Amino acid sequence: VNDLAVAISQSVNANEDINKSITLAGTDVDGDTLLYKITTLPANGYLFQTSDGTTRGDTITSIPTNISYANHQVIYISAKDGNGVNYGNFGFKVNDGTADTEEAIVTINVININDLPSATVQAVSADEDIDKTIILAATDVDGDTLSYKISSLPANGYLFQTSDGSTRGDTIISTPTTVSDTLQRVIYISAQDGYGDGHGNFGFKANDGTADSEETTVTVNVAPKVED
């Protein structure tokens, strides 16, 4: 009498956005050669066939799908920036040539990996010899609280801290300098009688508490005064 094989449930940890090789497991007291099949797709993320345990093959998009690799491995990856406990759970069965096992569950806990913030490029227009308030901006897919720092001083002109968006505070004279205003504002003024496209370009970075973004340039185009 044939004894059903047993598919073995397991729990694995994977890092967000990084391939995870998973070896499916089963046993059979009759010693039959076992076939593995995916029977429930991941709750989130993607499964792939593999021919060597490290290289992605075809995406597994339907069920049941037989595992093609003799070592009964698949590759899992989370949806972009996705993470959480039980995030990527999927199901599989084993077949001993006669019948399928009950479904076993592979529990996949995806660990959050910090994503760098992205400082936002912008171009602003300023008038010669007149203060210009500039609001720095950035985004972070992790939703972290961001701080801002000036990383390159203006090509020409001056930058100032501000506490209200209109009053000059300390002159920013070195880099990196953290922007003190909670609304990430700074004040720019051209060099005396200076103007031109790109006259006041400067650079900044955003920090998510773990790491800096790449530097982004604020392009400051200064218009000349209209002389009477």
Language model regions located:
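Proline-enriched interdomain boundary motifs that mark the N-terminal boundary
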Residues: 3-9, 115-121, 226-228
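Acidic, turn/loop-rich segments in luminal/extracellular domains of secretory-pathway
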Residues: 14-16, 21-33, 39-115, 126-131, ...
